[in-house]
Amino acid sequence: MIRSSVMGPTMFLVVLLLIASHQTSAWSLDGLARIEKLLSTSSSASAASPTRGQALNLKKRAILDQSCKGIFDRELFKKLDRVCDDCYNLYRKPYVAIDCREGCYQNLVFRQCIQDLQLMDQLDEYANAVQIVGK
């Protein structure tokens, strides 16, 4: 048999937990509602992000870069993309990664990234890769 002296504090604790749980879920729902409202009012988010079905129908080349009209070589793209990723990690500025890939890597930012990453000894190798994927 449970004593009433233990029952009182236990019952109080259970009620307190129920109230806290209800308040936490209300905060979560409010936050979710704010995020959904932001996403629904954002014109760029709805226009830029395709639905899942559309994303699956994209060609492999479209995922990487529309401006690359040359030979689709996954290893070359990975190598060139790695330069831009490393350059982004060096500077931590989103525009560095975007500008580095612009024009299928045929730009001054990509060349500057090669220089800043101290890859100038491999410049000819990267230049050939850019020519192959960007023809």
UniProtKB/Swiss-Prot annotation:
One of its GO terms (biological process) is neuropeptide signaling pathway. Keywords: Amidation, Carbohydrate metabolism, Cleavage on pair of basic residues, Disulfide bond, Glucose metabolism, Hormone, Neuropeptide, Secreted, Signal. Disulfide bonds join C68-C104, C84-C100, C87-C113. Produced by the medulla terminalis X-organ in the eyestalks and transported to the sinus gland where they are stored and released. It is found in: Secreted. InterPro entries: Crust_neurhormone_CS (IPR018251), Crust_neurohorm (IPR031098), Crust_neurohorm_sf (IPR035957), Hyperglycemic (IPR001166), Hyperglycemic1 (IPR000346). Residues 1-26 form the signal peptide. SUPFAM superfamilies: Crustacean CHH/MIH/GIH neurohormone (SSF81778). The keyword Signal applies. One of its GO terms (cellular component) is extracellular region. Hormone found in the sinus gland of isopods and decapods which controls the blood sugar level. Has a secretagogue action over the amylase released from the midgut gland. May act as a stress hormone and may be involved in the control of molting and reproduction. This is Crustacean hyperglycemic hormones. The gene is CHH.
